[in-house]
């Protein structure tokens, strides 16, 4: 599966690693991107998630903003290919969560990865993401105890990155996953989801990373929060969830 993702990625863009410890000011969207956003403006209709995350569809899907004050979508090609739509409740949950993180993590910028098609259905090669209740989030990273963004510019190629069981990037172990940032983000999502009549159904992250995730202050709170983080995965699925964490929401 990871090889399939790599081949797909290489068809979009070339692989390169850039040393970036601070993100630049968001650039003005390209003409093509601006036109796409204009054509897909969100309306006030409430979304309907039909079926399950692995066998479902989406009605009145909403396009997530390509960028905001402290977040952006990870890949323009994916965005323009119609892979960044969500249930309206999930969209509001995510945006409200990032608004809170502007205060609690003021020096951190986040990346949203693939979501769903506007009408849901199969989102190749994902097994879920079919009814607008699934979202992939890029793992935040550190280098020398500072937020690091040098790998965040790879677009779809980011799905091909690998991290060891301690959360260190395989090609440069000085680059590590910021587990405390992830833990706080998940706790924030839980709080905001409740306001929008949602709950976090499950979180998928490489199971060997859970000890690191639960180690810090927010990690300990996460462990006691009741958020279900999967305990076992098939080898293929497990290997694919080291550089991002997947969240499935459920309507309540």
Question: Model features per residue range: what roles?
Answer:
Residues 106-108, 131-135, 241-245:
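Envelope-exposed proteins and targeting segments
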Residues 117-168:
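Acidic/His-rich structured neighborhood in mature extracellular/periplasmic domains
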Residues 93-124, 202-232:
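Extended, low-complexity, intrinsically disordered C-terminal regulatory tails
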Residues 1-57, 61, 233-235, 250-252:
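N-terminal secretory targeting signals
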Residues 42-112, 177-194, 199-200, 204:
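Active-site acidic/histidine clusters and adjacent loop/turn architecture
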Residues 111, 134-140, 204, 246-248:
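Soluble periplasmic/extracytoplasmic beta-strand elements of cell-envelope proteins
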Residues 20-29, 146-252:
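Catalytic cores and adjacent binding grooves of peptidoglycan-active enzymes
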Residues 46-55, 60, 139-151, 212:
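Short, solvent-exposed beta-strand-terminating loops
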């Amino acid at each position: 599966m990871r090889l399939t993702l790599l081949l797909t990625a290489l068809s979009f863009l070339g692989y390169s690693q850039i040393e970036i410890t601070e993100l630049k000011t968001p650039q003005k969207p390209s003409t093509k991107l601006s036109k796409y956003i204009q054509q897909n403006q969100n309306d006030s209709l409430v979304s309907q998630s039909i079926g399950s995350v692995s066998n479902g569809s989406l009605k009145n899907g909403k396009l997530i903003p390509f960028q905001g004050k402290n977040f952006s979508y990870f890949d323009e090609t994916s965005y323009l290919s119609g892979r960044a739509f969500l249930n309206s409740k999930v969209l509001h949950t995510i945006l409200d969560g990032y608004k809170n993180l502007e205060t609690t993590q003021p020096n951190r910028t986040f990346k949203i990865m693939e979501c769903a098609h506007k009408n849901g259905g199969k989102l190749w090669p994902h097994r879920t993401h079919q009814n607008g209740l699934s979202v992939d989030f890029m793992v935040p990273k550190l280098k020398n105890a500072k937020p690091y963004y040098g790998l965040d510019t790879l677009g779809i190629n980011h799905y091909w990155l690998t991290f060891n069981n301690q959360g260190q990037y395989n090609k440069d172990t000085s680059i590590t996953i910021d587990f405390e940032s992830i833990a706080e983000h998940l706790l924030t999502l839980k709080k905001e989801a409740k306001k929008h009549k949602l709950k976090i159904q499950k979180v998928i992250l490489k199971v060997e990373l859970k000890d690191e995730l639960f180690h810090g202050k927010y990690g300990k709170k996460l462990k006691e929060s009741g958020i279900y983080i999967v305990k076992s995965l098939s080898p293929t699925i497990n290997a694919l969830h080291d550089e991002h964490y997947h969240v499935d929401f459920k309507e309540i």
